[in-house]
Amino acid sequence: MTTFLTVDDEFKRTLGYLPDDDLLDDQSLQRMKSALTAAEIYVQGAIGEENEDFYKDEKILPLYKLACYAIGANWFFHPSTAVSSTTAKAIIGQLRASYDESEVAKNGSTSKS
């Protein structure tokens, strides 16, 4: 499993921060990175970990980022009570179906045998 999303201006804005916000200290940036990395691991674990290129596909990447950002933001703001949002769960369901389709196209089956 490989994480490749970074705490960029887009993710900072998702969390309500401006890119050069004075309120962004090293601790906040580290929490952002941890939340985003954990969200990626969660999403990939929920969908499938075998095909890392799947998540970088131009048709998949926007939904993948949206799911990771939604979960990462939730965990950033509510670390002790965070659960996945309904939106993130719906996106994961869509991505799981797309992942299965790509595995069938690639291997002829979704099974790992």
PLM segments and residue spans:
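Divalent metal-cofactor coordination and adjacent catalytic microenvironments
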Residues: 1-113
